[in-house]
Amino acid sequence: MSIIKEFKEFAVKGNVMDLAIGVIIGGAFSKIVDSVVKDLIMPVIGVLTGGLDFSNKFVLLGQIPASFKGNPESFKDLQAAGVATFGYGSFITVLINFIILAFIIFLMVKFINKLRKPEEAAPAATPEDVLLLREIRDSLKQR
């Protein structure tokens, strides 16, 4: 088998297609999932937790410089100024994005796999002893 035929078989029949589909779908849905998390889920969680805004939750690790002109309670302002911060709220938001995106991709791959027809297995080769018995049978019939 030539290298090109082997590669074609690998690319078409292997997991490469599943991976490509996952990457394409993941890229297409990432903005939708970001919006669902940021605009729908996080506000509800904020209301349930008494107005908590996860995007602005952080721990200050360094000193705020004297020349800092932004809001000292704004994670984005502190990051822009280069102040060392531990942004756990942003991490929680990204983690929720990931979980939702992974679940959507899982459901889509599961659906695609249901649509695929199972490959027909090649018929098993007839064992040598069966072939020999057939030859003996045929030989006896001819006598």
Curated annotation (Swiss-Prot):
Cellular localization per UniProt: Cell inner membrane
Stretches that traverse the bilayer: 10-30, 89-109
Pfam families registered for this protein in UniProt: MscL
Methyltransferase recorded as keyword: no
Protein's membrane topology: Multi-pass membrane protein
Keyword set includes Transmembrane: yes
MF annotations from Gene Ontology: mechanosensitive monoatomic ion channel activity
Family matches, as InterPro entries: Mechanosensitive_channel_CS (IPR019823), MS_channel (IPR001185), MSC/AndL (IPR037673), MscL_channel (IPR036019)
Gene Ontology CC annotations of this record: plasma membrane
Keywords, in A-Z order: Cell inner membrane, Cell membrane, Ion channel, Ion transport, Membrane, Transmembrane, Transmembrane helix, Transport
Family: Belongs to the MscL family.
Subunit architecture: Homopentamer.
NCBIfam families linked: mscL, PRK00567.1-4, PRK13952.1
Function according to Swiss-Prot or TrEMBL: Channel that opens in response to stretch forces in the membrane lipid bilayer. May participate in the regulation of osmotic pressure changes within the cell.
Protein name, as recorded: Large-conductance mechanosensitive channel
Organism: Burkholderia mallei (strain ATCC 23344)
Organismal lineage: Bacteria, Pseudomonadati, Pseudomonadota, Betaproteobacteria, Burkholderiales
